[in-house]
Amino acid sequence: MTMHPLSLACLLGMAICTSAHATDVAAASAVPQATALPTIEIHADTQNGFHSAAPVQTDKSDTPLAQTPLSITVVRRALLDSQQSLTLVDALHNVSGVVANTYGRRGWDDLIIRGQTASDALFVDGLRTAGSNRVAEQLFGMQQVEVLKGPASLLYGQVLPGGLVNLISKRPGTEPMRRVDLGLGSDGLRQGSLDLNQPLSANSKAALRLTALAMNSDDPTEHVYFRSRWIAPALALDLGERTDFVLLTSYQERDYIRQQGLPWEGSVDPNRNGRIDRALFTGEPGQTPYHSHQSRLSYVLDHRFDNGWSLHHAARWQAFGLDGLLIASNGLAPDLRTLRRTGMQQAFDGRTWVQDTYLQGDFLTGSWQHTLTAGADAFKTWEWNVQSTCQVGTLNVYAPVYGRPIVCPTTPSRDTLNVVASGGAYLRDRIQFAPDWQLLLGLRHDLSHNRSEDRGAGAQTRNDTNATTGSAALMFDTGGGVHPYASVATSFYPNVGTDVQGATFGPEHGRQVELGAKMEVGASTSLSVALYDLRRRNVLQNDPLHDGYSIAVGEQRSRGVELNAAADLGSGLSLFGGYAYTDAVVTDDGGQRISSVGQRLNNVPRHSGSLWLQYAAHGAADGWSISGGARAEGEKSAYGHRIPGYMVFDAGLAYRQRHWHYALNLKNAFDHDYFTGGLQRAVALGDPRTLLFSVGVDY
């Protein structure tokens, strides 16, 4: 199915108009009732709905989201629970301008923001992660997901210009809470989780929280499976009324055989032999599964001085490991039925230390009100990578016979150590220079040291860089809840590694200009629109002539528009949706022999979007809720192939009775066959119809 180019935009537009009108009507009709009887239920809906007006951690300020001249989308826990989202990919399907799961069910977090790769831009509690997407994040342990779109180097340093994803961990609370959930689903999904919170002091400021999860699941593809174990104790200490201190820890183990997609011919492209079965496994049933583990130990300290200034300090130590055998498609033979395969025995081992510290305070210069943020951050990461290229026999994709030998050499083809150390200082001033005008100015300087060591060859390369980046934004308050703004921001990202000649790469630089507007309708509806032009220069891509090496191309450009809506409309109705138009192309290929100027960037649809509605019943049907929505992507291209667009529909039904919670969700309700993206020699499969059922109890 090819999505009509503007169908989702029209759908979202109608939803936005409906939400704005419904909010006005609901507000007008609710005033007498709210005045006469301000019930706790209304407050609970506000706290647990889809809409978020509160300040976000990603902005490093206490400014309400509608008054922030940045494109930030917040996916709250209420929306995640309504959809029974199990993975970060599930959560990001709700965010306009984000393309998730481009490489299918391979066990990693793959994402693109505003047309630019962002898999290395994953943050947890405001601190960068190690190895980024190689160990998939555990969504159950997160309270909400914040996505900052556009260059974020001012506050976060070395970040690719498309944006970043910041996951906010569940933290100890002030109320006792114990919850256990059990879940079952399609393809043998079995999941159990617990979430416990216990105050430890009379004022409940000291508290302990424990979250844990165990999950086993098979896959629509034969021989593919996923096993996950995760636990996260967190401790809040009472260090006085002016100081907050939280210790956050987690440990995760995952074992899986990844889904590697299918050959292009016979799936997306025609094949004279017919269609290839979507359940085909292109690896070997006896291959070594992937095993990954990840440990985190972090703390967050916030102190409020008596002069109105505040100090924030956070740090984390993280270790991860990943090893396993990859069997990948190497293309079909001329008979278009014999799949040539290659194997890669992989082992990654990484360590990361990261910290961020900043002071923040308000002061006046004449009639101008300033909010100044001055900070410094640093990180150091070590990553060892050992790989061996293995020989694997061919496979008849129409009549597969498994059991071919896998021959791996005793000497690895790659044995490298990469060390990245970086530090930066930043300064941001939010200036209210008139009652309705604010100006945001920021400047940052980074120093970066990268060292790559080829332990097999005994060679070593160094790449030391420094860069100054910044941002500026102007926002106007119209007085009617509408806040138009204009902004410009730059980014910096050091390129690691060498080309086939052994030469190091210069750093990437990005720049974005954005025009937008944010609107608050009442207290529980927010709408936003953003138009942007983003340029990314000196971008690394795979060398088309030398496998395993990279080249730097001249420039990529993304232009687009994004619409967003989040609303809790009263009477139990909530809405969350977004639409994006993204035009992402190569504008300068650096003079490559085979020109790519004008080509669309891989796996980026021009049109994409989603919409989710939920209705929580009252009166005789109190406790029941029903939800549903759609998510869609238009046609996109990948490595010279066309991937058709799609639209899939999801639905949910939930019931709550005192301490018991029941939820039933159906994803891809009409079992539409679709594809999410592609690699050079394989196309990634979308998820078929999936049924999820869960039961939980509070005690």
Task: Describe each PLM feature range.
Residues 436, 533, 552-639, 694-698:
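Gram-negative outer-membrane beta-barrel transporters
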Residues 215-219, 231-238, 242-304, 319-350, ...:
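Acidic/polar loop-and-plug regions of large Gram-negative outer-membrane beta-barrel proteins
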Residues 140-143, 154-233, 239-245, 295, ...:
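Outer-membrane beta-barrel translocator/receptor signature
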Residues 236-240, 350, 369-381, 416-536, ...:
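Structural signature of Gram-negative outer-membrane beta-barrels, strongest in the C-terminal barrel
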Residues 117, 570, 575, 631-637, ...:
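C-terminal beta-signal and adjacent terminal beta-strands/loops
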Residues 297-320, 341-454:
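Face-selective signature of the C-terminal outer-membrane beta-barrel domain
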Residues 31, 35-176, 180, 515, ...:
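Acidic, small-polar-rich N-terminal luminal/periplasmic segments of exported/outer-membrane proteins
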Residues 300-306, 310-316, 320-326, 484, ...:
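Membrane-embedded beta-barrel scaffold of Gram-negative outer-membrane proteins
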